[in-house]
UniProtKB/Swiss-Prot annotation:
The chain crosses the membrane at residues 45-65, 94-114, 126-146, 178-198, 325-345. It holds the Pfam family CER1-like_C. GO terms for molecular function: aldehyde oxygenase (deformylating) activity; iron ion binding; oxidoreductase activity. Its EC number is 4.1.99.5. Aldehyde decarbonylase involved in the conversion of aldehydes to alkanes. Core component of a very-long-chain alkane synthesis complex. It comes from Oryza sativa subsp. japonica (Rice). It is found in: Endoplasmic reticulum membrane. Identified as LOC_Os02g40780 in PubMed:17138699. Belongs to the sterol desaturase family. This is Very-long-chain aldehyde decarbonylase GL1-4. Disulfide bonds: none annotated. It is a multi-pass membrane protein.
């Protein structure tokens, strides 16, 4: 929102929220009526292109979003080395509004101008007219309109909304108040109306011109330099006809320079080109290699989780993951296809996120594998090969710590990472499974006045550490798994072993659990508090019970470039396993935490609090 919003700031369908696509219902109804009356042959090319062209524009923009986020996480060609936060993602959530607006106006134009219904697929002379009119009147008028928008009166009421994003993403290009978009549409309609008036309009000419506008808008706001220098060396005048991402980036950081739409020519002739444009272009193109201090290695969970990655769909990634959202299921076919392609061609981890905490740099890498694949016996070796490759790549790059997230540290897969430590005893990178901090977070979430807990966790080292710590506190630990009970009892000091009890009766209302099924949840007494020790949340089956979060903590304000949620966790909340790796790097601890090794619980907790991580309240 602008600092002092003026008239026509909001889109007309703003109050519809996610149901805004209903505004295209008249177009759908019109087409359906014609097909039912006269068959598919009754649809002319002009009408037939309205809805498909809107869909293609959305796909085009999404490709740019994913590409930009991927490159700014890993590339040395980043232009503005600052992060974006959730407020920018929320502000730019409605990037498709202008596509809907264009669709409605094109439909109105189709109804109002019968001549366009007979237009051919392509006219070369029409394309030439479009290019000339854009280069002249459109670029000229846009330049002066843009300069007017930077006058205090219009800037405070309209254009400041766009400039709230100093670090741009491709979709920043279309984040403007409704009134601005009306003017932009009028400007971009000039070449199209010119071809209609001259009688050389064509379907592909219109679609191609709009695709050009989208491409240049997205490229100019992508925040990484990709225009190669050799293009300008081969044809020097091109420097005045096509801008670069670094050229337009200066407009967002300096505000009073580089006003041109896509052609810097007008900034040159009116002396508004930023003097550092060439220097920034060259330095961004050259780039600087960067080595992260920490890598967190994760993976996809279920099919739709690919959309929840930071490089997926921005608005979905900015919220805690939920597979119950109806719109996620509409994307299922594409999710299934991406899973198959990842399974066949995914041969290494890929970078999905880049975070900074003061001077420490972190990256999140994801393996192209899903939860169900970790349960397949024949997939264990290939998955371990992927993890091993990621560890060796991190070691070669000089990364200090690599933390294993989700199932990448499963005991049955690689012994909590011990497999790699044994195989490569001279590793420089420290392998962390985060068990020490995860244990600490669980223990700190148990009420201090608790006298009894019910433990249903299996035999993981976190479960053992929790049982031992609770017995040391004098808390009675009740279990109903005989085999696990005897295994744990043998590891508890004799003077504390009496606090461990095997029983199925008088089960308390405080349950510490790993992964329990629906039947076990139904057995819990009313008012039970479930505290999970797993990285995966429990299914919230009971409304009369309380479900705590998986082990996690709130991150400090100093941690920057956080604009996506870690799986199902709330905003600016990070799993204990991820945080453990950060602490390892911050503190310079030299030990591995994998296999049976575990960091001191209190030491891990104290370090987390000291560095600004805060405990969570209940989920």
């Amino acid at each position: 929102m602008a600092t002092r919003p003026g008239p026509l700031t909001e889109w007309p369908w703003h109050r519809l929220g996610n149901f805004k696509y209903v505004v295209m219902a008249p177009v759908v109804a019109h087409g359906a009526r014609r097909v039912m009356r006269n068959g598919w042959g009754d649809l002319d090319i002009a009408f037939s292109l309205i809805l498909p062209s809107l869909l293609l524009r959305m796909i085009h923009n999404q490709i740019w979003i994913s590409l930009s986020r991927y490159q700014t996480a890993r590339s040395k060609h980043r232009i503005v080395d600052r992060g974006i936060e959730f407020d920018q993602v929320d502000r730019e959530r409605g990037w498709d509004d202008q596509i809907l607006f264009n669709g409605l106006v094109f439909y109105a134009g189709y109804l109002a101008m019968p001549s366009v219904r007979r237009m051919p697929v392509w006219r070369t002379d029409g394309a030439v007219v479009t290019a000339l009119v854009h280069t002249g009147p459109v670029e000229f008028l846009y330049y002066w309109f843009h300069r007017a928008l930077h006058h205090h009166f219009l800037y405070s009421r309209y254009h400041s909304h766009h400039h709230a994003s100093i670090v741009t993403e491709p979709i920043t290009s279309v984040i403007h108040p409704f009134a601005e978009h009306v003017v932009y549409f009028i400007l971009f309609a000039i070449p199209i109306l010119s071809t209609i008036y001259l009688g050389n309009v064509s379907a592909m000419g219109i679609v191609g011109y709009i695709a050009y506008i989208d491409f240049m808008n997205n490229m100019g706001h992508c925040n990484f330099e990709l225009v190669p220098e050799w293009i300008f060396q081969i044809f020097p005048p091109l420097k005045y006809l096509i801008y670069t991402p670094s050229f337009h980036s200066l407009h967002h950081t300096q505000f009073r320079t580089n006003y041109s739409l896509f052609m810097p020519f007008y900034d040159y002739i009116y002396n508004t080109m930023d003097k550092s444009s060439d220097e920034l272009y060259e330095s961004s193109l050259k780039g600087t290699e960067e080595t992260p201090d920490l890598v967190h290695l994760t993976h996809m969970t279920n099919l739709q989780s690919a959309y929840h990655l930071r490089i997926g769909i921005a608005s979905i990634a900015s919220k805690p993951y939920s597979d119950s959202a109806w719109y996620m299921w509409t994307l299922w076919p594409l999710a299934w296809l991406s899973m198959v392609l990842a399974w066949i061609y995914g041969s290494s981890a890929f970078v999905v996120e880049r975070i900074k905490l003061n001077k420490m740099k972190m990256q999140t890498w994801a393996l192209p594998r899903y939860n169900f694949q970790y349960g397949l016996t024949w997939e264990r070796e290939p998955i371990n090969d992927l993890i091993e490759k990621a560890i060796l790549d991190a070691d070669m790059k000089g990364v200090k710590v690599i933390s294993l997230g989700l199932l990448n540290q499963a005991k049955q897969l690689n012994g909590n990472g011990e497999l790699f430590r044994q195989k490569y005893p001279k590793l420089g990178v420290r392998i962390i499974d985060g068990s020490g901090l995860a244990t600490a977070v669980v223990l700190k979430s148990i009420p201090s006045d608790a006298k009894k807990v019910f433990l249903r966790t299996g035999t993981s080292k976190i479960a053992r550490a929790i049982a031992i710590a609770l017995c040391d506190r004098g808390v009675q630990v009740i279990m109903n798994e005989k085999e696990v009970y005897h295994m744990l009892k043998s590891q508890i000091p004799e003077n504390r072993a009496s606090y461990l009890k095997l029983s199925s009766d008088n089960v308390p209302q405080l349950w510490i659990v790993h992964n329990i099924d629906d039947n076990e949840q139904k057995m819990a007494p009313k008012g039970t508090i479930f505290i999970p020790i797993s990285q995966f949340p429990l299914k919230k089956l009971r409304k009369d019970c309380t479900y705590m979060s998986t082990p996690a903590m709130r991150i400090p304000e100093e941690m920057k470039n956080i604009h996506s949620c870690e799986n199902w966790l709330p905003r600016r909340v990070m799993s204990a396993w991820h945080i453990a790796g950060i602490l390892h790097a911050l503190e310079g601890w030299n030990m591995h935490e994998c296999g049976d090794e575990m960091m001191d619980i209190e030491k891990s907790w104290s370090a987390a609090i000291r560095h600004g991580f805060l405990p969570l309240t209940k989920a």
